[in-house]
Structures are given as structure tokens and as C-alpha cells.
Amino acid sequence: MGWDAIWVPEATNRNALVNATLLLGATEKLVVATGIAPIHNRDAMASANGQRTLDEAFPGRFLFGLGVSHQWLVEDVRGGTYTKPLPTMRRYLEAMHAAPFSAHPPSMRGRTVIAALGPKMLALSGELADGAHPYLVAPEHTAGARAILGPGKILAPDQKLVLETD
């Protein structure tokens, strides 16, 4: 189809890491990104090692998008406890970075972006991740997000549009 990348969601549907594996295995150049995998769906070590496994098998073709999800999904659907998003995401990313991996490490470190809208989460995206994936933002949001992230970080805003001739 001529696409360079595809983003696969995860909330109450298919497992994003499994979907990413299937798509990466069926293509040769396509970059597959999770947009967004909730951190409450798996612990930090499972996420880190899943990412490392995909990076080993498909170097440079997987982008791990992570987010804190929504309180109702975490508590009412998953039966978990929703805590303050910023410190929760910080602890999760730090735990991912520290997670042991006994297998042969991939040749390159995997890339991670986080769902970030506000200035504090955007700053965390620049500090502990490779960038941000702001969801449903106006075009004006992008300039401010770039200023917070700084150059060299991934900024992948999700902006909806309607193609119409009327």
C-alpha cells in the first residue's frame, strides 16, 4: 500500500505486541508502532522484554507506544488501581530500563514513545522515552509539544481529519 508505518491500538481488543509481531513478520520494511499499549496490561519487565524480543527479530522496525490508559478501563474493566499518571509512568519507564534480560540483547536499543498531552508528561517523554504520541490534539498543540520535547525526539501526534469533497 505504500505505507511506511502502521499504528496498532490496544485497550480492550487484540494484544498489541502479538499484533505487532504478526505485522512485522508479514512485511519486510513496515514500521509497526503500538498506539497505545496501556501500561496496566503487563508489568514493566514483560513490556521491556517483549520490546527487546521484537527489536532483536526486527531491528529498527518496532516503536513501543505506551500510555497510562483511563481510570474506568483500569479499575472497572481490568480490576486494577489507577494512580496518578505522571509518577506511575515514571516508575514504569524506570522499571523497564532496569528490567533484566537474560537472552542475547538486540543490536540496538528499542524506541519508546508515551501518550502525552500535558507539559509534564511531554517533559517525561523527552527525559525517559524517545518521544511522545499525543492523541486527538489540534495542530496548534504540536508546536508546543515540540518545544517541550526538544529536537531529535519523536513527535507523532494523532490528528483526525475528514476527506470530503462537499
Language model features by range: what are they?
Residues 1, 162-166:
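Short, intrinsically disordered, charge-balanced linker/junction segments flanking boundaries
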Residues 1-34:
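N-terminal beta1-alpha1-beta2 module of alpha/beta enzyme domains
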Residues 4-8, 31-35, 62-66, 112-115, ...:
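Hydrophobic faces of well-ordered beta-strands that scaffold small-molecule active sites
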Residues 11-14, 37-42, 81:
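Glycine-rich "substrate-gating" loop/helix at the edge of Rossmann-like oxidoreductase active sites
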Residues 12-22, 136-151:
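Active-site-adjacent beta->alpha loops and helix N-cap segments on the catalytic face
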Residues 12-14, 68, 118:
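Short glycine-enriched loops at secondary-structure junctions
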Residues 108, 113-121, 128:
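Internal, conserved structured core segments that host functional sites
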